[in-house]
Regions:
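Hydrophobic alpha-helical transmembrane segments
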Residues: 154-169, 173-204, 379-384, 390, ...
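Signature of the first transmembrane helix
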Residues: 3-63, 93-101, 128, 225-255, ...
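Interhelical loop/hinge segments that connect adjacent transmembrane helices in multipass membrane
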Residues: 1-4, 174-184, 196-241, 284-301, ...
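Interfacial segments at transmembrane-helix termini and the short loops linking adjacent helices
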Residues: 104-125, 321-352, 459-464
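Membrane-proximal transmembrane or re-entrant/amphipathic helices at the cytosolic face
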Residues: 449-506
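Helix-loop junctions and terminal segments of transmembrane helices
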Residues: 27, 57-73, 144, 263, ...
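N-terminal membrane topogenesis motif
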Residues: 1-24, 45, 76, 200, ...
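Membrane-interface junctions at transmembrane-helix termini in multi-pass inner-membrane proteins
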Residues: 5, 131-155, 349-380, 391, ...
Length: 506
């Protein structure tokens, strides 16, 4: 087995372990031992730090990979490349610090009325941002060395475990106060960055010794233009996922941010299939679009297959979440409070479904000569999201933040996919997707009939009965949906997976 395969397997295992830790932490520790306001505080601090670090990074991660062939040689310092990966983000962080203190008054005024707790702890976002920044830098360096498993383990397992310990020390064992919890957050990310650095140094394959011999005027110009593009892309790309959290914190308070954060975590499950499949399919789309002439037919066929499969997988996950959402909140610690985010779950899950079904389109644009236009569409997305969040949250509350996200994405994908169809000639739509949506409606209809029948037979069910009924109902709805997909020949890939599964059972 090659090094890439081994590293991929180890990284995947680390990711799934991290998901399990994150699930337990979010749904059984945070909701039980922290108030919604405290959950909101930890969420906004990390969101702010992530945003700050993305800007300070100045595109170093992508630039390192792009310009690595120019520096590559047999030396440990790759002719000064690793040195620049330390210096450029540090300069970016200094620039960010100047901007932060210049606009500190605006930040305080925006949050002081409804989220004074965030104002009290906003300075802690700075060290967290610094540590997250260099975690990203060291991970990029490890990627060059083709050693991604340990950095992935540090990010997915160590960081999540450290945060879990902090939450338990604060909420369950009462060893530390809120100040101590925030310091544990800082220390956890700091140790994560330090462990990444130690791993690189102990590998004895890297050196941060400076070397200016490869910095030509042409390289400097190319690097500056590419970095400018990446900074702008990072700005819009990092702002978008955190906009609603910031607006809700500023206009409603951290308690509502905590409720929104839990709802968003539930909705994020719809995206899980997209994350893995998107990384696999991108090289194949790139090959189709980079041939001379581009194989538009192959790219379109692949695009439609991926969109259909993603729509099917995401829709099934969304339905299974939604038909059990009331029971989930009843089982969740302090679920009566977090149930206020029920409709946020549905709205955000639909927006995640749109991303899973059509997100490949934006990525495929990167492999054409119109790659730079993706930045323009992303800017439109962010501006729409800012305007809609500002307008809808005061009217609709946390649901307004979810509606703002969904509406922004719908408009964004209409514009983006229209442009891709016009310029590239590919599109994700096929009649099979109408079958997928019809199957989803049938599954929801079947669930409704079962709930109606059970409700007539049992008027005041116990919690144990509700759990058993939910398990049985979920199995029935899933099996019926799977049979319709199989015999309706909706997706050859899904049918092949089903046949493989049946052969394994036999």
């Amino acid at each position: 087995m090659g090094i890439i395969a081994r590293q991929t397997i180890k990284g995947t295992i680390a990711t799934y372990i991290g998901v399990a830790i994150g699930f337990v932490t979010t749904f059984f520790i945070l909701t039980k031992y922290l108030t919604a306001e405290e959950v909101g505080l930890t969420r906004v601090l990390v969101d702010a730090a992530t945003l700050f670090s993305s800007l300070a990074l100045m595109g170093t991660g992508s630039s390192t990979l792009r310009f690595y062939p120019h520096f590559k040689d047999d030396s440990r310092n790759q002719q000064g490349l690793y040195f620049w990966t330390l210096i450029i983000p540090f300069v970016g962080f200094l620039i960010f610090l100047i901007c932060f203190f210049a606009f500190k008054g605006l930040i305080v005024r925006a949050f002081q009325d409804n989220s004074p707790l965030f104002v009290n702890y906003v300075y802690y976002a700075l060290p967290i941002a610094f540590f997250v920044l260099y975690m990203s830098v060291f991970e990029a360096n490890a990627t060059i060395l083709e050693r991604v498993a340990v950095p992935r383990m540090i990010r997915e397992v160590f960081i999540r475990t450290g945060l879990l310990v902090g939450y338990l020390l604060y909420g369950l064992w009462h060893v530390i106060d809120l100040d101590g919890l925030v310091m544990v957050l800082c220390a956890t990310y700091g140790l994560g960055a330090l462990l990444n650095l130690c791993y690189l140094l102990f590998s004895q394959k890297i050196s941060f010794k400076p070397d200016f011999s490869k910095i030509t005027p042409e390289l400097r110009r190319d690097f500056l233009w590419y970095t400018l593009f990446l900074i702008t892309a990072a700005l819009v790309g990092s702002v978008m996922p955190t906009l609603s959290s910031f607006f809700i914190s500023a206009k409603m308070g951290l308690m509502f941010t905590g409720i929104y954060a839990i709802a968003n975590y539930i909705a994020t499950m719809v995206e899980i299939p997209f994350r893995s499949l998107n990384a696999i399919v991108q090289p194949r789309i790139a090959v189709a679009l980079r041939t001379s002439p581009p194989d538009i037919s192959a790219a379109t066929r692949l695009y439609q297959q991926v969109s259909t499969n993603q729509l099917l997988a995401g829709m099934v996950i969304l339905i299974l979440i939604w038909i059990n959402i009331d029971l989930f909140f009843d089982l969740l610690p302090n679920g009566e409070q977090y149930a206020a985010g029920k409709w946020v779950v549905l709205i955000l899950a639909i927006s995640k479904l749109a991303t899973t079904a059509f997100g490949v389109g934006g990525s495929s644009l990167s492999y054409t000569r119109w790659y730079y236009t993706s930045l323009f569409f992303t800017l439109i997305l962010v501006v729409l999201s800012i305007c809609l969040n500002n307008y809808l949250i005061p009217i609709c509350g946390i649901e307004g933040g979810a509606w703002a996200t969904l509406a922004s994405l719908v408009i964004y994908y209409i514009l983006l996919l229209s442009f891709v169809w016009w310029r590239v000639g590919t599109h994700p739509f096929s009649w099979v997707q109408l079958k997928v949506l019809a199957i989803g409606l049938l599954m929801l209809g079947l669930n409704y009939l079962i709930v109606l029948a059970v409700g007539k037979l049992v008027h005041e069910p116990s919690m144990l009965f509700r759990i058993c009924e939910a398990i049985a109902r979920t199995l029935i709805v899933s099996v019926v949906g799977l049979l319709i997909v199989y015999y309706g020949k909706v997706s050859p890939h899904v049918n092949e997976l089903i046949r493989k599964g049946l052969r394994m059972v036999k």
